């Protein structure tokens, strides 16, 4: 397999606290890779460093064979790297459909001046149908349930046909039925060619969905391997499972 994302010796300090400590791992193209670890282990900070929401103090991020020097979210988005957040981020005052149009790279002026292409509107409606949100297309996004906003955010990042999607706790705060729905959509997009890196606390979901699994502790990987091996690794049991 080919490395799509390479994180090399990534380091981030906040004052005297080292949140990410020479962190290195690889996400292979075509994989669903998990990044797990106890609370405070640095998972979301790694996501923020990789996607340009935080500057790194040291280290390198390589995406699709190119080093991302001073990565910026918009630049990475155009290159095919998208992400979601722990708390679903949508434009509550816009309609559900308009959220996807904006995600295609169109600003407010484009929408109001009818500059959005027919192709983008068609893709937006197709994604809303795929994610079970078509009946809410004209509803303000703020009216959706929290779980539906999670699905909307996921659909929005797919507008650009990304090569790699980083999902930050995609099932946090949603009901069991929606967890199954989210898993279905991850599998479907993966089957269509999208690579995923997922931070998730639902270990049952991680173990049946992801391989490999990267385990962080104190900002650094302590184990990378298939789910069955990770579950039995003494370092993981000590650091993550609290054994």
Spans of features found by a protein language model:
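Glycine-rich phosphate-binding loops of nucleotide-dependent enzymes
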Residues: 2-243
């Amino acid at each position: 397999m080919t490395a799509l994302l390479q994180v090399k010796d990534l380091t981030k300090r906040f004052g005297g606290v080292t949140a990410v400590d020479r962190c290195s791992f690889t996400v292979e193209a075509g994989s669903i890779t998990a990044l797990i670890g106890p609370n405070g282990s640095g998972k979301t900070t790694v996501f923020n460093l990789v996607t340009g929401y935080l500057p790194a103090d040291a280290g390198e991020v390589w995406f699709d064979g190119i080093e991302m020097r001073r990565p910026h979210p918009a630049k990475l988005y155009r290159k095919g790297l998208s992400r979601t957040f722990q708390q679903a981020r949508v434009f509550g005052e816009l309609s559900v459909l308009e959220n996807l149009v904006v995600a295609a790279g169109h600003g407010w002026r484009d929408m109001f001046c009818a500059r959005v292409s027919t192709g983008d509107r068609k893709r937006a409606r197709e994604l809303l149908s795929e994610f079970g949100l078509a009946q809410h297309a004209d509803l303000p996004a703020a009216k959706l349930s929290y779980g539906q906003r999670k699905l909307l955010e996921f659909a929005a990042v797919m507008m650009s046909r990304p090569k790699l999607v980083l999902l930050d706790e995609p099932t946090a705060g949603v009901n069991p039925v929606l967890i199954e729905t989210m898993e279905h959509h991850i599998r479907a997009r993966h089957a269509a060619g999208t690579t995923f890196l997922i931070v998730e606390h639902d270990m049952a979901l991680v173990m049946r969905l992801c391989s490999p699994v990267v385990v962080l502790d104190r900002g650094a990987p302590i184990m990378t391997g298939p789910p069955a091996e990770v579950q039995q690794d003494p370092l993981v049991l000590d650091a993550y499972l609290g054994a």
